[in-house]
């Protein structure tokens, strides 16, 4: 006689979920199917807090002030120039570098963000609870600098809701020999100063590309100068962020308030959520008035957490000793 052990499947087995009992096939699928997403990638400004806070408007004004006070740009041109640079380069900072201005990045960020009305932001416990309940990797992806990102998240009470922050310094690691893809190093790569201070932040007029005059022509000839800055909505910036964080674009959900950033994300394979309007646009898989509408708009995001809520009822399969 020889004895052996095996797991018997002849005993009755049933489990229940939120909606009731699951049959055997549903039980198998429940434990074998992967969630649709591995990671939720969030923009910061005007996405995790509303546009009505006034920070975006203040940021634009601060950029104009910096251009006039520190770069000696004619106040009569600063407003138009700010608009054209943002439209054509993704950020005003990237545009200023493209057309020939030299300045210290840390100084500009400190000037522009240091004067923002952070007092308009308040802790958001509702958003915090929602984010903490989502069973995925969660990352911030912003064009802003690390100081602003940290301060904003801290005020909102969300500083520990995210695994890491991909920011200006992450995407523009000047003076680094390589970009780390270590997940533990996602937060704030490339913290070294990205340009050396110059004796003057202004530049001679002969060195500056006149983008206003160029675009005012009926048929502008040539192409605009390229910027050394990597930022959204560049597809290269999004692909770099995905590489740094080791993300599969087809298993990542991207949250943004910018239509052009949403469309760029869609082009690289991301599923996308436009925040700030309920009107869907080309490139947006979902459109929400507020990030707070997420549970109602995409309830499936919480289904990935179903396994932790499974309740077993009845008799389970048990190890049985048999004689053969």
Stretches found by the model and what they are:
Residues 47, 142, 257:
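Conserved G/P- and acidic residue-centered "switch" motifs that form tight phosphate/ATP-binding loops
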Residues 2-3, 7-42, 47-125, 136, ...:
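N-terminal helical cap/lid subdomain that shapes the substrate entry/recognition surface
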Residues 54, 118-122, 140, 225-233:
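Short, surface-exposed alpha-helical recognition segments that flank or form part
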Residues 1-37, 132, 146, 150-324:
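Asp-based, Mg2+/Mn2+-dependent phosphohydrolase catalytic module
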Residues 68, 98, 117, 139, ...:
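Short, flexible active-site loop motifs that bind/organize anionic cofactors or intermediates
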């Amino acid at each position: 006689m020889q004895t052996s052990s095996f797991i018997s499947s002849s005993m009755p087995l049933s489990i229940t979920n939120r909606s009731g009992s699951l049959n055997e096939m549903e039980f198998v699928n429940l434990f074998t199917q992967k969630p649709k997403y591995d990671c939720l990638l969030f923009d910061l400004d005007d996405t995790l807090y509303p546009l009505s806070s006034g920070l975006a408007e203040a940021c634009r004004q601060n950029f104009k002030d910096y251009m006039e006070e520190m770069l000696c740009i004619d106040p009569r041109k600063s407003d138009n120039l700010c608009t054209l640079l943002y439209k054509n380069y993704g950020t005003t900072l990237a545009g200023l570098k493209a057309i020939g201005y030299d300045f210290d990045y840390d100084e500009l960020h400190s000037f522009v963000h240091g004067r923002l009305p952070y007092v308009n932001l308040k802790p958001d416990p509702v958003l915090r609870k929602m984010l903490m309940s989502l069973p995925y990797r969660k990352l911030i992806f912003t064009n802003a600098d690390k100081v602003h990102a940290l301060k904003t998240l801290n005020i909102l009470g969300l500083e520990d809701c995210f695994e890491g922050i991909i920011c200006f310094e992450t995407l523009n690691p000047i003076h680094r020999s390589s970009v780390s893809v270590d997940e533990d190093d996602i937060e704030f790569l490339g913290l070294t100063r990205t340009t050396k201070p110059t004796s003057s932040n202004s530049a001679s007029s002969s060195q500056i590309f006149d983008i206003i005059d160029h675009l005012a022509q009926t048929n502008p000839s040539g192409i605009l100068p390229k910027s050394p800055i990597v930022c959204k909505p560049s597809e290269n910036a999004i692909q770099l962020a995905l590489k740094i964080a080791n993300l599969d674009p087809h298993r990542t959900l991207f949250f943004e308030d910018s239509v052009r950033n949403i469309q760029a994300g869609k082009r690289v394979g991301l599923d996308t959520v436009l925040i700030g309007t309920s009107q869907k646009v080309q490139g947006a898989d979902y459109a929400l008035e507020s990030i707070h509408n997420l549970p109602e708009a995409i309830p499936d995001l919480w289904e990935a957490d179903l396994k932790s809520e499974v309740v077993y009822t009845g008799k389970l399969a048990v190890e049985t000793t048999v004689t053969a």
